[in-house]
Amino acid sequence: LVFLPGWDEISKLRDSLNADYNVSRSASVLPLHSMVSPADQRKVFQRPPKGMRKIVLSTNIAETAVTIDDVVFVIDSGRLKEKSYDAYSAVSTLQAAWISQASAKQRRGRAGRVRPGECYRLYSTSRYNSFAEYQLPEMQRSPLEELCLQVRVLAESGAGVVDVGPGSTAGFLSRAVEPPVAQATDNAVQLLKDIGALTPEEGLTRLGRHLGELPLHPRV
């Protein structure tokens, strides 16, 4: 099981391995990514024929979301593709970044589930020690328009799910265990007002109620 940042790295390594005669005749190279069809994704869980190795090239989805129980060796690049958001420029980016120590431990734990295994990390101990203990929560590295809209929808649903009150979306989110940057919340609320989803007092408009029912970013 090889952990790589994203589809570009997976496809390049797959092509390189398949182009090597010694590898292609003795191993089946299988990518695990949302770009791969469900039928091909299921192949990573099948045992390889006798005399053949199975090489799975995956993103961090194989850390916890799926379990391939016959993995013996793990190769960890130490990288992932992570969405980040600059609250002050209101710009989102998806870029390669170093994983956290928690992710490194999860990746190591994928090896040796059915027999003794090994994990090869393609980074030094000093690099590992520089990793954050955990990845930043998604709420701290994503635009918050969808979340703020859902907060208002739940607050005005009458179901008592959340107690927000008028004009206090930022205050509600600030009580989260790991709250977002205040500027990010302010940006999100302002955008929802600008597109007519919220009133100046942060109440839901008719448009806001309709947008809250759609599985789309409000701006779309």
Regions from the PLM with identified roles:
Residues L1-R219:
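P-loop NTPase motor module signature
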